[in-house]
Amino acid sequence: MITKTHKVDLGLPEKKKKKKVVKEPETRYSVLNNDDYFADVSPLRATSPSKSVAHGQAPEMPLVKKKKKKKKGVSTLCEEHVEPETTLPARRTEKSPSLRKQVFGHLEFLSGEKKNKKSPLAMSHASGVKTSPDPRQGEEETRVGKKLKKHKKEKKGAQDPTAFSVQDPWFCEAREARDVGDTCSVGKKDEEQAALGQKRKRKSPREHNGKVKKKKKIHQEGDALPGHSKPSRSMESSPRKGSKKKPVKVEAPEYIPISDDPKASAKKKMKSKKKVEQPVIEEPALKRKKKKKRKESGVAGDPWKEETDTDLEVVLEKKGNMDEAHIDQVRRKALQEEIDRESGKTEASETRKWTGTQFGQWDTAGFENEDQKLKFLRLMGGFKNLSPSFSRPASTIARPNMALGKKAADSLQQNLQRDYDRAMSWKYSRGAGLGFSTAPNKIFYIDRNASKSVKLED
């Protein structure tokens, strides 16, 4: 059965050899449609001794047979995926000849060890992979031809592992749809291919930059990663639909690491808090401005109210000074009452009632007896009717001058006596500082008219 199918496939490229010579990249697209590609690549997975021992895999050639038996079923699925995948960039379908040489080298090495009969058959499969296109691919070549011209420069700079790794997610989807068991083998294959890519990264660091850029674009399109093994068909188709919209809005949403998400959310929270705090700070400022405006409008509208406010503020600041003007009379009255009590004003008021006359400030003077007071008042002319103090009514009379108390009168009397004694001593001791001594028993009399000076008359 296998040989017959390959004979049919080999008959097609003889008719369409001219198109293959002109456009080599489209022929590489046939690798996706033929399930022989899986047969060619599978020995790579089988060669690793650690994985074959760990997972209990069978020898290499039985795996090739199993995959060939399932060729028809998988090829139909591949043909269904051909039409949607034509829109993707042509670099997705590239496969460099250097990688093919490695695959053929593995096939020859493995076939030489076990069976020499299988080696020409494997080579025929490889030749079929190179030259066997489906009839649909001839139509797709014309569509993809224009895109290939644009992406020629990217194809030249493309690396072998990149093209191989680009195709891996699509193969995962095709085999997952057919059989869940095959997905594990494809995942192992992808890991081995990634290991080969890491080895070639060290050799060519310049080509690594182009690889990183292509990987970013592929992840933007939403293809399934090799680590995810069991998605359904609906889940496979949904990332492709979303991939067309995602690059427009967000450049690389899948590339964001999980560790950076809390930091980014924290930054967003901090920004939102700052935005929330700014209006809170601005509101008191607006209130202050409004208050200032209200005060200015109040000054312009009601100047009298503002003046009263200033008066109240002055009173609060300077209580003593402002109270002095209002409480002056009260203090004077209190002082007058105290002085009157000490000086005996009560007795004077009684005599005043008895006499029926007002003597002004002399009423406040303190006397030992009433007779002494009356005698003093008569000598001062207090009882004369012509006195202006009597004629004036009590309301019109100003504040009476307070008479001295006993203590003040005694101090005043002592001061006057001292001054008198000093003057008399000066009169007696005139010229004493010049060496003359005064006669102790001599008495002098004060007389203005008598003088010892000589008057010269012209």
UniProtKB/Swiss-Prot annotation:
Phosphoserine: residues carrying this PTM: 42, 50, 111, 132, 265
Location(s) in or outside the cell: Nucleus, Nucleolus
GO molecular function: RNA binding
Modified residues (Phosphothreonine): 308, 310
Biased segments, Basic residues type: 64-73, 145-155, 198-218, 265-274
Cross-link (Glycyl lysine isopeptide (Lys-Gly) (interchain with G-Cter in SUMO1)): 249
Cited PANTHER family: ARGININE_SERINE-RICH COILED-COIL PROTEIN 2, LYSINE-RICH NUCLEOLAR PROTEIN 1
Descriptive protein name: Lysine-rich nucleolar protein 1
Organism: Homo sapiens (Human)
Lineage: Eukaryota, Metazoa, Chordata, Craniata, Vertebrata
